[in-house]
């Protein structure tokens, strides 16, 4: 497959889909296998976001092709082989850019008094 180029970190990217965001979020803390990514997405979203294996692995394949994540050496858990994944340098930049975009939206909403500020 042809690898799609990721824009430079300084360029604006469209908002990430929830599946992409939560996969990158889960991998920001370190290498994980697919099931651990699914569980982490559910945990960090407070149960608001769940994804099935079809969505997970289709999205993982796309992120691999884009170079946002990398497959690491396969781990062996009790004779079961699992593929593990980690963020690439580009993936870290894209995840950080998305967090900055979200933070900017929250600040804008607070300035417009659409949501309360922290602690008040």
Question: Model-found features: residue ranges?
Answer:
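Intrinsically disordered, low-complexity serine/threonine- and proline-rich regulatory segments
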Residues: 1-18, 98
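Beta-hairpin "wing" of winged helix-turn-helix
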Residues: 64-81, 86
């Amino acid at each position: 497959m042809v690898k799609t180029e990721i824009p430079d970190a300084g360029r604006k990217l469209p908002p990430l889909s929830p599946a992409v965001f939560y996969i990158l979020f889960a991998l920001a803390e370190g290498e994980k296998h697919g099931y651990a990514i699914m569980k982490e997405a559910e945990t960090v979203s407070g149960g608001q976001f769940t994804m099935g294996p079809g969505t997970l692995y289709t999205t993982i394949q796309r992120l691999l092709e884009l170079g946002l994540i990398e497959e690491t050496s396969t781990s062996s858990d009790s004779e079961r082989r699992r593929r593990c994944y980690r963020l690439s340098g580009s993936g870290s930049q894209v995840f950080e850019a998305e967090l900055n975009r979200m933070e900017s939206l929250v600040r804008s909403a607070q300035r417009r008094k659409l949501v309360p500020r922290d602690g008040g």
